[in-house]
């Protein structure tokens, strides 16, 4: 069912039946039939707009009040479908998870999932979460929480990282977006803390750092899920409210076992002496390429100086880890193991990537409107831009097109951003416009399309942006608009597309583009391209507006000049009188 077709339907009168039949009151049977039809239509619309599957729907599209054959057949077909799904589920459950016991088993597993693990004394990966019962005596409550939330089978990054972490090894992990990295570090972190019997108010033992508040909130939500019912562990996110309570000595930080935080807020509390990081046993840096970048590197370094426990274990996770970040990681770690799932600089193979040449800035808006007309604009959609000003401008343009759209950027408060994300996940917003503030980590499971309205400044930024779609093995699409000014900036993106196997998403002439020098790469990363304003206002109207503005400015200038002249005249007259 095409929801847009239903919403655009009109109404007409049947001329053949005559006026009396058109305006006659409906009978009881007709009313009931119409009611069933409306209910089924409403259910269909609800299901189609529930992009992220967060709502509860009626399983039967018809009520049981009628006694017709159609209702009976519908119920029977529903029962048959239910039986079929139960049978398939039962068959799936009968298939035993793979048991990995030897190095040969581990190598076969790694070849199958394109995993590369380097370092000394590499542990054998787990084949299932049940493997952890025998090998690591996983807490039963944690295991049941995983199963209850349908985390039945571990992903390749989880299979590799969990045994490495539980063997107390430092870790550098790189895996595609949407591959389950959050659980890959949360499960062993929680398991190690629960396995040690320590006194209450011992102090913070686990610290997770993330670059954005949105990502920190998401990590904390996952942490709450797997620790539900575990009374001996206390977890928290360092929110503005909690930071205030700690700084005012209302609460002591020693009551928490695990803290999730962004760097600046954590540093502020630590500097005031209201949080002790000296007892931390496990430090996890999520989105490490961002936190070791020039914007966050000093903050990350300051946090590391306060983590003074000699037995501390460090882990870094990201979808992209450049060689410069690896070098920095090696300098702060002890004999780390390195996991690469897939290619180091590639995007998920579930994402269909495409480069679209638009000529100029106006061409980008025309391209979006063309996508809408051709039915390629299937919500939910995320559109990325390079600046807040441009995000706001596009928001107003798409509002003019009467699209169900909202915008997120750094100028909006955390509460406003949370509300927009919630509405987007519920399907109330179909198109979300944003800057790179949402490019990392935030998990939207049902996003169909990502549009890079502005070309990202690096291959890493591109991988993280398009990683908002194609998550958890689902198919997704990513479209990047580029203009004549982006001829050099698209080269890193082209390399990512090649490594991901998306050779049909760009024109063949792009193959002949030369390699970028180090100087050119640095310039692209550090200097944003100066772009024209986002607007579809005709040139004639723009000129008229400019003329009017110039006239107003000239009028104001003349008034000021006349005032100054009159003041000078009055001053000279006063002098003469004296």
Swiss-Prot record:
Task: List the biased-composition ranges (Basic and acidic residues).
Answer: 44-53, 78-94, 517-531, 561-578
Q: What is its main location?
A: nucleus
CDD domains, A to Z: DEADc_DDX52, SF2_C_DEAD
Q: Which SUPFAM superfamilies match?
A: P-loop containing nucleoside triphosphate hydrolases
Q: Where is this motif: DEAD box?
A: 286-289
Give the InterPro entries listed for this entry: DDX52/Rok1_DEADc, DEAD/DEAH_box_helicase_dom, DEAD_box_RNA_helicase, Helicase_ATP-bd, Helicase_C-like, P-loop_NTPase, RNA-helicase_DEAD-box_CS
RNA-binding as a keyword?
yes
Ranges for domain Helicase ATP-binding come to 162-339
| Gene Ontology cellular-component terms listed | nucleolus
Disordered: annotated segments = 1-95, 517-578
Record comment regarding domains? The Q motif is unique to and characteristic of the DEAD box family of RNA helicases and controls ATP binding and hydrolysis.
Q: What is this protein called?
A: ATP-dependent RNA helicase CHR1
């Amino acid at each position: 069912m095409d929801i847009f077709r239903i919403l655009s339907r009109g109404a007409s009168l049947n001329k053949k039946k005559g006026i009396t039949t058109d305006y006659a009151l409906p009978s009881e049977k007709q009313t009931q039939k119409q009611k069933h039809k409306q209910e089924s239509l409403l259910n269909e619309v609800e299901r189609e707009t529930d992009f992220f599957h967060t709502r509860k729907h009626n399983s039967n599209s018809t009520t049981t009040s009628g006694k017709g054959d159609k209702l009976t057949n519908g119920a029977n077909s529903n029962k048959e479908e239910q039986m079929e799904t139960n049978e398939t589920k039962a068959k799936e459950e009968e298939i035993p998870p793979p048991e990995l016991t030897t190095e040969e088993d581990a190598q076969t597993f790694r070849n199958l999932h394109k995993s590369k693990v380097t370092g000394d004394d590499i542990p054998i990966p787990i084949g299932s979460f049940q493997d952890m019962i025998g090998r690591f005596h996983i807490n039963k409550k944690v295991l049941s929480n995983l199963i209850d939330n349908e985390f039945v089978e571990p992903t390749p990054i989880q299979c590799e990282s969990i045994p490495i972490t539980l063997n107390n090894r430092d870790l550098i992990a790189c895996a595609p977006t949407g591959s389950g990295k959050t659980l890959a570090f949360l499960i062993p972190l929680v398991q190690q803390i629960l396995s040690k019997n320590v006194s209450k108010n011992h102090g913070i033992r686990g610290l997770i750092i993330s670059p954005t508040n949105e990502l920190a909130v998401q990590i904390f939500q996952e942490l709450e899920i797997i620790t539900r019912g575990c009374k001996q562990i206390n977890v928290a996110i360092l929110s503005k409210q909690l930071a205030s309570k700690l700084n005012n000595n209302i609460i002591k930080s020693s009551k928490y076992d695990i803290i999730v935080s962004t760097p600046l807020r954590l540093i502020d509390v630590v500097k005031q002496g209201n949080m002790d990081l000296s007892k931390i046993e496990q430090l996890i840096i999520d989105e490490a390429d961002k936190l070791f970048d020039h914007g966050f590197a000093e903050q990350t370094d300051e946090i590391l100086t306060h983590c003074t426990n000699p037995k501390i274990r460090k882990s870094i996770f990201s979808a992209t880890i450049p060689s410069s970040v690896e070098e920095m990681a090696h300098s702060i770690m002890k004999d780390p193991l390195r996991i690469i799932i897939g290619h180091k600089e590639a995007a998920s193979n579930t994402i269909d990537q495409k480069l679209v040449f638009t000529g100029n800035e106006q061409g980008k808006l025309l391209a979006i409107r063309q996508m809408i007309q051709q039915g390629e604009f299937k919500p939910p959609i995320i559109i990325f831009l390079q600046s807040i000003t441009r995000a706001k401008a596009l928001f107003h343009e798409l509002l003019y097109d009467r699209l169900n759209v909202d915008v997120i950027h750094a100028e909006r408060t955390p509460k406003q951003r949370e509300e927009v994300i919630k509405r987007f996940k519920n399907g109330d917003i179909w198109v979300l416009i944003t800057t790179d503030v949402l490019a990392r980590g935030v998990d939207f499971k049902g996003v169909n399309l990502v549009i890079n309205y502005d070309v990202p400044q690096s291959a890493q930024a591109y991988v993280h942006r398009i990683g908002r779609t194609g998550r958890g093995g689902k198919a997704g699409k990513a479209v990047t608009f580029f203009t004549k000014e982006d001829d050099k900036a698209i080269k890193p993106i082209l390399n990512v597309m090649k490594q991901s196997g998306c050779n049909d998403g760009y024109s063949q002439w792009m193959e002949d583009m030369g390699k970028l020098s180090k100087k050119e790469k640095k310039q692209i990363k550090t200097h944003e391209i100066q772009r024209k304003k986002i607007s579809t206002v005709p040139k004639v109207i723009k000129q008229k507006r400019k003329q009017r503005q110039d006239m107003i400015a000239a009028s104001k200038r003349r008034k000021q000049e006349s005032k100054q002249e009159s003041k000078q005249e009055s001053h000279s007259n006063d002098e003469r009188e004296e």
